[in-house]
């Protein structure tokens, strides 16, 4: 490939990135789709753009346009931002949610703040795996079904019940009230629950009974 074509291809990549990503949003090389551009050329152009200062490299396979602070200094991405974009909201599409102890804390079912965040994601590389993003560790789990914007609240509700004994230090009746309010706020009906509850361990029925949780009847 001659130098003119190489330059054109790099400019095309730069415009593609500018049109599809905002400052502070992780760019995963696996998500870049430019017809005719090989993986080898993509890596080459990303390196050139990084060397020129047009974009920044967070870690292998992850780049970004940096935000600037009030002093005009470039701000680096945080591991949590990368984790959210990689495993929870990928290119604006719901692909996962916080789970386990992290979910219990975010739902108000526990006051404990877990050191390692847990996420259930369609992009989980295995059934359960501990992953490291820079200096932070995450537990990534495969969900019982594919996560979508339509079913995420039901899965969070059922996950919370499944892990209720393990993840909360509160009285179960109080947990039931919190989950009942969550169910009402998110219009979680028995019909929606019945679609997924058989994917969960049988102990979930015990949790429903003991918490006296209620959900929308229809």
Predicted features, each with a name:
Residues 132-142:
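A short, charged helix-loop
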Residues 1-11:
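Short, Lys/Arg-enriched N-terminal segments with co-localized hydrophobic residues
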Residues 39, 43, 56, 96-97, ...:
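Alpha-helix N-cap/helix-initiation sites
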Residues 38, 109-110, 134, 203:
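Short coil/loop linkers at secondary-structure junctions
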Residues 58-62, 89-129:
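Short gly/ser-rich loop at a beta-strand->alpha-helix junction or flexible surface loop bordering the NTP-binding
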Residues 74, 89-93, 147:
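Short, surface-exposed loop/turn motifs that are enriched in glycine and acidic residues
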Residues 143-218:
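Hydrophobic alpha-helical interaction segments
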């Amino acid at each position: 490939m001659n130098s003119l074509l190489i330059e054109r291809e790099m400019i095309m990549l730069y415009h593609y990135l500018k049109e599809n990503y905002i400052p502070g949003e992780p760019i995963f090389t696996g998500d870049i789709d430019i017809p005719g551009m090989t993986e080898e050329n993509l890596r080459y152009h990303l390196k050139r753009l990084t060397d020129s200062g047009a974009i920044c490299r967070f870690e292998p396979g992850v780049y970004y346009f940096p935000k600037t602070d009030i002093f005009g200094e470039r701000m680096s991405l945080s591991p949590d931002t990368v984790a959210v974009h990689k495993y929870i909201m990928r290119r604006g599409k719901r692909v996962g949610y916080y789970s386990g102890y992290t979910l219990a804390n975010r739902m108000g079912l526990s006051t404990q703040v877990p050191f390692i965040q847990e996420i259930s994601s369609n992009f989980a590389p295995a059934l359960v795996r501990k992953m490291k993003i820079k200096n932070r560790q995450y537990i990534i789990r495969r969900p019982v079904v594919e996560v979508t914007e339509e079913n995420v609240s039901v899965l969070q509700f059922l996950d919370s019940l499944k892990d209720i004994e393990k993840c909360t230090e509160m009285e179960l009746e109080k947990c039931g009230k919190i989950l009942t309010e969550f169910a009402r706020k998110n219009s979680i009906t028995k019909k929606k629950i019945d679609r997924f509850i058989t994917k969960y361990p049988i102990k979930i029925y015990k949790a429903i009974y003991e918490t006296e949780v209620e959900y929308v009847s229809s």
